[in-house]
A protein has these predicted regions:
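Glycine-rich phosphate/diphosphate-binding loop of Rossmann-like nucleotide-binding domains
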Residues: 6-42, 155-238
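Short beta->alpha connector loops at strand-helix junctions that form conserved
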Residues: 36-37, 60-61, 94-95, 117-122, ...
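Conserved PLP-enzyme active-site core in the AAT-like
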Residues: 57-61, 226, 239
Length: 239
C-alpha cells in the first residue's frame, strides 16, 4: 500500500499522524510511506528520522496526497481539498464525522472516499484507543497548566500545588472521573496536590480509588457536594 503523511495545516498544531517508529513498522510489512517535508518537526521528528525508518520525503502536501492510497492525517482535509482526493482513496483522520455537513459527505461519497474517523475507532471491548490517548495527554497537561496558574505571576493565589514544610498543598477538585479526569488526578498527585473527584457514577468513583488509591477523595456529584467542594477548592478542573 502507498501511505501518505502530510504536514498539518492548522495553526499551533504540532502533532503528526505517524511517528518514525510507525513508519518503520509499515515499511517492514512491505508498504511504501510518503512523508511531506517537515511533517514531524513540531513533534520533534526530523525528516532524516523518517528517511532512516524507510519513508520517502516529498516536498509538498499535494504530492503526499496524490501518491497515497491511504492518507493519514491528524485533521481531516479541508473541503476545498476534497477535489484533490483520488477515487477509492482512504483518509484516516479526526473527521468529527457527526459535524460534517451533508453536502460535504455527498462529495466524499461521489468520489468513493473511505473516511475513517480516529475518534470512532473502537477496540472489541468498546474502548476508544485514540481518544483515550488524547484524553490522557489532555488530563496530564491540564494538571500541569493548572498548577502554574496558581502562581502569582499568572494571577493565581500564590499557592505551590504540592505545598512545603508547614504549608499545606493545594486543593484540586476534578469534576468527572473519566479518562481525562483520572489522568489529571494521577499527575496532580505526583505534584503533591490534595485531589477530590466528583462524578455521577459510583462505579467510576470506585474505579478511581482502585486505580489511584486512597489519596484521592471521591464524592458523588450532587448539588450539595458540588457547593462544598467548590467552597474549599484552590483549583477546579472540568473533565
Amino acid at each position: 500500500m502507498q501511505i501518505g503523511i502530510p504536514k498539518e495545516l492548522r495553526a499551533r498544531e504540532r502533532r503528526v499522524a505517524l511517528a518514525p517508529s510507525g513508519v518503520r513498522a509499515l515499511v517492514q510489512q512491505g508498504h511504501q510511506v510518503w512523508v511531506e517535508a517537515g511533517a514531524g518537526a513540531g513533534a520533534g521528528f526530523a525528516d532524516a528520522d523518517y528517511e532512516s525508518a524507510g519513508a520517502t520525503i516529498v516536498f509538498g502536501r499535494l504530492e503526499a496526497i496524490l501518491r497515497s492510497e491511504i492518507l493519514a492525517c491528524v485533521h481531516a482535509p479541508e473541503p476545498a481539498e476534497y477535489e484533490l482526493l483520488q477515487p477509492g482513496q482512504t483518509v484516516i483522520a479526526f473527521w468529527a464525522l457527526p459535524t460534517v455537513r451533508p453536502d460535504e459527505i455527498a462529495i466524499l461519497q461521489e468520489r468513493g472516499i473511505t473516511a475513517i474517523g480516529l475518534e470512532v475507532i473502537e477496540e472489541a471491548d468498546g474502548s476508544a484507543p485514540v481518544l483515550t490517548a488524547m484524553s490522557e495527554i489532555a488530563g496530564g497537561l491540564a494538571a500541569i497548566i493548572g498548577a502554574s496558574l496558581l502562581l502569582n505571576e499568572f494571577g493565581g493565589k500564590g499557592i505551590l500545588i504540592g505545598g512545603t514544610t508547614g504549608v499545606p498543598q493545594a486543593q484540586l477538585v476534578i469534576l468527572g472521573a473519566g479518562v481525562l479526569g483520572r489522568a489529571a488526578a494521577r499527575v496532580a498527585l505526583g505534584l503533591g496536590a490534595q485531589v477530590t473527584m466528583l462524578d455521577t457514577s459510583i462505579p467510576r468513583l470506585r474505579a478511581v480509588v482502585n486505580e489511584l488509591g486512597r489519596p484521592v477523595t471521591t464524592m458523588l456529584s450532587t448539588l450539595p457536594n458540588l457547593e462544598k467542594a467548590l467552597g474549599f477548592a484552590d483549583l477546579v478542573l472540568g473533565a
